[in-house]
Amino acid sequence: MQKDNTPNLAIPSLGLALIPIILTIALLGVQIFYYDDFTPHIALAIGFAITALVGWSQGYRWKDIESGAFHVLHVAMPSIATLIVVGMLVSTWIASGTVPMLIFYGLELIDPSWFLAASMLLCSVVSLSIGSSWTTVGTVGLALIGIGSAFGVPIYWSAGAVVSGAFFGDKISPLSDTTNLAAAVTETNVFDHIRNMMPTTIPAMVIAFVIYLIVGGQTDVDTAQLAQIAQFKEGLSSHFDLGILPLIPLIVVMALAFFKVSPIPALFTGFILGAIVAAVNYDYNLNQVLTFAHSGFKISTDTASLDSLLNRGGVSSMTWVITLMMFALAFGGALERTRCLESVVRSILRLTKGFRGLQTSAILTSVATNVVSGDVYLSIALPGRMYGPEYSKHGYSRLNLSRAIEEGGTLVSPLIPWNAGGAFVIGTLGLTVVSGDYSALLYIPLAFACWLSPVIGIIYAQTGWFSKRSDEDVMSTQPDSENSSQPQSLKGNI
């Protein structure tokens, strides 16, 4: 969050603050649903311009609004750089045989009937261990997409399971940046914060796991599918080294992530190691490796479906995603700088009454900030900063708030295509969206764990279950009284 350097300027009225938000959402809706065109970039740029006009009407100078956009872009530069490095890493990990090896042995070891459930669990464990959903999606997740393709599982189902696991593991990892941010902005202990998320985390994970098991159990691998799996394995084994050497880049990246090395140097190290293994194993020269890193890996295995899976990666594959992120972040930065977001949140706070309203509003504010700003960090920091005093005022622990903003922030981020998280998922997993075919975006409702958690959180908010008083060490499992403004002892604690 940036510091407001113009404290004398008034916060815009709610009606004025909503103008750029409503018009931008309307423009996006017309473009996507009426004209069947999923290229939100220019609509977001127009939204930025409308926000600038609103700011100008309130006395903001252009350089104030510009600095707001640049500030958010500056904060997001590590995420943008991560996207670039992941594009480079994907191409060299395919060229080196790292991804093909994971796909090959995955086809050997994983049964199609429990592939989806296993994908979610594996990504959860990896993300929990290293604290990075993005690294998990870009490495293990990419291989799982390949395995699912061989099994005949639609890419949106595989992506839904990968996203569910990767972002859920990130949510409850003490190594995660968003987990630590949620704890820091609400002034709570990170381990207390993680424990307090279990009442929503466990049910959401269990429900998602059961759904994936049921769906996977209905998967029938017929003769044609068995033939395709055999073709995949034959193509992989005949074109790639499936020994121990291609595993080195993955092991090193996982180790660096576990020891909390920043994602960019960790992933760049993986890219370099992948390039070295590719050069050693397959005699690629320097120019070929650099071409892979820029334009993506290219190969012909005589199996079209395998070729489409392996011919990907490179910096150029991320340009659409990166520009989308930049437009969305600039729009969000302008909304924050002109205090439009603050105006909306303050208006919501004036209408909230009791714990039910407070907790529900906090979750929905995080979700809305994710949608409007495209920035997961802002979706955690803004409501965390603005709702915190209200929780303290009414005698509720800020652990309730930290749970709310994590659910509406971290978990919803990958479900919004123009958000940093959603853009990364789409770009990395190859979820191609073309006019008239939005099937790739079906991963959004199929990432069950990501949206079930905030839904369960809202249910708890409405019932008062698992609400925590500021002076209590345990959580209530009984409904809260809406009419009392003073903290009261809650019964039925566990």
Where are these regions (language model features)?
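Membrane-embedded alpha-helical segments and adjacent helix-loop junctions characteristic
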Residues: 59-149, 302-389
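Alpha-helical transmembrane segments and their immediate interhelical/interface regions
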Residues: 35-50, 158-184, 223-251, 333-335, ...
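Juxtamembrane and boundary regions of transmembrane helices in multi-pass small-molecule transporters
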Residues: 33, 171-174, 183-234, 393, ...
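Alpha-helical transmembrane segments in multi-pass membrane proteins
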Residues: 20, 24, 43, 47, ...
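Hydrophobic transmembrane alpha-helices that form the pore/transport pathway of multi-pass ion
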Residues: 111-203, 366-407, 432
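A late C-terminal transmembrane helix in Major Facilitator Superfamily
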Residues: 405-417
